[in-house]
Amino acid sequence: PLLAARRLLGAELIGRGVTAAIVEVEAYGGPADGPWPDAASHSFRGAGGRNLVMFGPPGHLYTYRSHGIHVCANVVCGFDGVAGAVLLRAAVVRTGADVAGRRRGPAILPAALARGPGNLCSALGITMEDNGIDLFDADSPVRLTLGEPVPSVDGPRVGVSKAADRRWRLWLADSSEVSAYRRSPRAPAPGASD
């Protein structure tokens, strides 16, 4: 997952009239018995229900609702049958800022159009109905185009209570679109075992 996360930084996400370059991601592994055990992952307890897409082929979109409200998008990155995904946390809108602005609201500054996972999905028109689509299929409503690898900074993931110190959040250091870091109040103290 971490290799895939690095590869997704700088990639272009194209969806419903908006093109955005990905500037922040978080990697998530899979079940306890898999190659990348990750207690913070939706797939940690195994395949079932909403997380089945995470066990499917790589390059597909896994969507879920955060706190029952915000749609969040992940790129599946494990090989078929092995869970892994990369959460798309933030992007800079390159084209279609007017469309993204209508979706997000008139008071939103350009740098904030796709800052944060829920805002990114809102700006690009990604919904729960997009769960499972192939991001590399030219006919998909949301597509991904990889670019050249870019230098990144890493740090702990945002808002997770398990595996909170894992440095699987990556971002472009010079981007004003990167979201703020917030540690989960339920996470153990930094450096403590979880």
Curated annotation (Swiss-Prot):
Keywords: DNA damage, DNA repair, Hydrolase
GO molecular function per UniProt: alkylbase DNA N-glycosylase activity; DNA binding
Family matches, as InterPro entries: Formyl_transferase-like_C_sf, MPG, MPG_sf
EC code(s) of this entry: 3.2.2.-
Keyword DNA damage: yes
Pfam families in the record: Pur_DNA_glyco
Superkingdom as given in the UniProt entry: Bacteria
BP-aspect Gene Ontology terms: base-excision repair
Family: Belongs to the DNA glycosylase MPG family.
Name of this chain's protein: Putative 3-methyladenine DNA glycosylase
Gene source species: Mycolicibacterium fortuitum
